[in-house]
Amino acid sequence: MGSLCSRNKHYSQADDEENTQTAEIERRIEQETKAEKHIQKLLLLGAGDSGKSTIFKQIKLLFQTGFDEEELKNYIPVIHANVYQTTKILHDGSKELAQNELEASKYLLSAENKEIGEKLSEIGGRLDYPHLTKDLVQDIEALWKDPAIQETLLRGNELQVPDCAHYFMENLERFSDVHYIPTKEDVLFARIRTTGVVEIQFSPVGENKKSGEVYRLFDVGGQRNERRKWIHLFEGVTAVIFCAAISEYDQTLFEDERKNRMMETKELFEWVLKQPCFEKTSFMLFLNKFDIFEQKVPKVPLNACEWFKDYQSVSTGKQEIEHAYEFVKKKFEESYFQCTAPDRVDRVFKIYRTTALDQKLVKKTFKLVDETLRRRNLFEAGLL
């Protein structure tokens, strides 16, 4: 009898402890749910190489504490890999052009650089790259200065040569220093393919200011095979920030060299717009890589892209660049309204000219995005 009472007392204490733990868990869940309601989700989308991951890194630098020394050091192998990959692309591209072009001779490497090129191409094809040494830098610089490589570079849009090629080649000595720690500029130029989902929480007016909105920004893989992973992020998103690299109108995809990058961006933009879960979602379109766009327009006709085949040049210099930009902007506006059902026209749609590497411009742009979304929230609450 006493034993039974003792057991009942024990069970009663256990139940009380369990109930207390359950109540605590429920309380914390309720608190977290309330806190989550005040956090606005932003989904950062765009095709591969649109510059969206650079935007993501800028947010970390601008509205958080940036990268600590350990994080910076983690970029060393990434930057070294970028150097080797760029070198391989240029070397292999020159070989291909030398075999297929009428003016093949200008793509032929000098005798002394031929062996160097083969060695560096082999390194660039490995899964694990060696640390960048002074001797390897000497070889890379010799290859980079070869007239055949410089001629190949002029055909970079056909060969998947990254935008950061010049930056890397100009900083080889610094990258190979035994005491090298990447700068924030190095990190911004570093290219690492986004696979899966990464997120960051920030406030454009500073975490300590109570009036500031808090955002959670999600960056997802841009290549085609990554897009199926986006679905679980779609519901309940405050805004989609869509990055379009407007400078890539004459380039093809990394994963499908038959497909024009701008056409892929157009199709992706329209696909996202038509998703039912975005019917009330605000859209912020970043027409990115304007710095490269303004350099390219005078050299490469905009109608090199099928989508822009009706483009007609009207002038030269800055006036022509502005005309070209406004044409591209109008094309995206037309796509937006064609893909937006009549009952969705009240959702916010804004277009921003951006250069992901320009920190001041990115900061200004996100302040404008913040202002737009705050006004939208006030309007929906009936306060405007």
UniProtKB/Swiss-Prot annotation:
* Cofactor(s) required, per the database record: Mg(2+)
Its UniProt domain note says: The helical domain (69-189) is required for self-activation.
Residues reported in the UniProt entry to bind Mg(2+): 53, 194
Region described as G1 motif: spans on this chain: 41-54
The cross-references to Pfam families, in alphabetical order and at most eight, read: G-alpha
- The domain of life for this entry's organism is Eukaryota
**Gene Ontology terms: cellular component:** cytoplasm; heterotrimeric G-protein complex
UniProt GO MF annotations? G protein-coupled receptor binding; G-protein beta/gamma-subunit complex binding; GTP binding; GTPase activity; metal ion binding
| Bilayer-spanning residue ranges | none
Start and end residues of each stretch annotated as G2 motif: 186-194
The name this protein carries in UniProt is Guanine nucleotide-binding protein alpha-1 subunit
Mark the residues modified by lipid (N-myristoyl glycine).
2
What quaternary structure, including any partners, is listed in this protein's UniProt entry? G proteins are composed of 3 units; alpha, beta and gamma. The alpha chain contains the guanine nucleotide binding site.
Q: Keyword Magnesium: yes or no?
A: yes
Q: Where is the G-alpha domain positioned along the sequence?
A: 38-384
Q: Which UniProt keywords apply?
A: GTP-binding, Hydrolase, Lipoprotein, Magnesium, Metal-binding, Myristate, Nucleotide-binding, Palmitate, Transducer
Query: What PROSITE patterns does this protein's entry cite?
Result: G_ALPHA
Q: Quote the SUPFAM superfamilies the UniProt record gives.
A: P-loop containing nucleoside triphosphate hydrolases, Transducin (alpha subunit), insertion domain
- Family in the record: Belongs to the G-alpha family.
Positions of region (G3 motif): 215-224
One GO term of the biological process aspect: adenylate cyclase-modulating G protein-coupled receptor signaling pathway
